[in-house]
Each structure stands twice: as structure tokens, then as C-alpha cells.
Amino acid sequence: MRVKICGITQPEQGRAIANLGANTLGFICVAQSPRYVTPNQIREIIEQLPPLVDKIGVFVNAPATEIINIVAQTGLTGVQLHGDETPEMCQQLKISLPDVEIIRALRIKSSQSLREVALYFDSVNTLLLDAYHPHLFGGTGATIDWEILAQFKSPIPWLLAGGLKPDNLVSALSQLSPHGIDLSSGVERAPGDKDLDKVAELFQQLHRWKSNFKEKLMEN
């Protein structure tokens, strides 16, 4: 399973989180965010990471030219669009950055907003479904309504986000079947300051879920 830890701000924490098992790290490229990191900071962190770890830059309503420039400066392997980006803009980036993963993050408020997800199936590589907040775009700690997602099917990979933390992870994965999970505030002491004990606990819970899942498969 893909495990993305978002809001990395410190090189030593990024390296430690990758060593604990995270295969994807996220960097906030939004200046107004308390988790914001500059392109230079992102590059410094990336230089200390294992090569197989995916490095995702998170943007909110940034111009395509800015995104392309930051990817070139930093070595990001993916771009996550967390604002009001249209399918057309996503497609434009996909063409401009053919070797870069394009992730569209969508805040799910209702069944209707979930139906709108289909508009992006052809224009991105991956989807990320997050909790809705009227004023904030992500990292809120709010939990998405899992019942809305119960019947969700996607032809492309999707990540579950929205208020995930070690103590509710097993419950979420028992109800849903995402290709991966995304956590930020659920493994933090403060915005941008990751709690490595919580990250370790997260992987313990994930191992527990995998063991239970295998047991159920064998029973059937």
C-alpha cells in the first residue's frame, strides 16, 4: 500500500519517515501554509531521501508555469493539485510534465461532490480524496465521511486522506479499499513538526491491518 506523509519541513524528519516505511512524502508549496517549504528547502530534503521515495509538491491554484519551474528546481517526482484546478489544467500539466505524476486532490462534501470526481479520471494519474472544509484546502485534521466513499470505484489509483491517524487507520481500511493513504496532522506535534513515534505507530497499525486482512482471505 502507498503511504504518503505530507507536510514535511525538516530533512532529518523526512529521512527518518522514509526509513520507517513511507514510500511517498509531500511538500507544501503554498506560502500561506504553516507547513510551507521553499524550493531550496525541498531540494535539500530530497537530496537526503532514498531514490525510490516519491516526492510530491502540493499546490493550490498556482499557475502552471510556477509549478513547472518548481519541479525543475527541486526534483519533485509528482505534483498534487489541491485547489480549484480544472480537468483542462490538469491535462495541460500532464502533457507539460510527462514524467511527473499528477495527483488531483478533491474535498468530498457529499455524494454529489464524489460524482464530480469522474471528471478527472482521464486528466490525472492519481486521485486523493480529502475531507471538506469551507475555508481550508487540506491538513485540517477533519475526517472524511467514509460512508460516502463506501461504493466508490475508480479506474485510476486513489489515496484516502482526511483526518487519518494511527488510532482510526484500521477502521478506515476495514471499510474502504484505497490504493494508498495520506496523513499530515494525524502524525504531528504541531504543523510541520512530525511526531516520529506516531509515524512508527501508524506502520504498526498498518501491519496489524494487513495481518488481519490475510487471515480473512485464508478463511474464505
UniProtKB/Swiss-Prot annotation:
Gene3D superfamilies the UniProt entry points to: Aldolase class I
Cited InterPro entries: Aldolase_TIM, PRAI_dom, RibuloseP-bd_barrel, TrpF_fam
PANTHER family from the UniProt entry: N-(5'-PHOSPHORIBOSYL)ANTHRANILATE ISOMERASE
Domain of life according to the entry: Bacteria
Alphabetic keyword roster: Amino-acid biosynthesis, Aromatic amino acid biosynthesis, Isomerase, Tryptophan biosynthesis
Pathway this chain belongs to: Amino-acid biosynthesis; L-tryptophan biosynthesis; L-tryptophan from chorismate: step 3/5
Cited HAMAP family: PRAI
Natural source organism: Gloeothece citriformis (strain PCC 7424)
One of the protein's GO biological processes: L-tryptophan biosynthetic process
Name of protein: N-(5'-phosphoribosyl)anthranilate isomerase
UniProt cross-references to NCBIfam families, sorted A to Z: PRK01222.1-4 (NF002298)
Catalytic reaction list: N-(5-phospho-beta-D-ribosyl)anthranilate = 1-(2-carboxyphenylamino)-1-deoxy-D-ribulose 5-phosphate
One example GO MF annotation: phosphoribosylanthranilate isomerase activity
EC number: 5.3.1.24
Family: Belongs to the TrpF family.
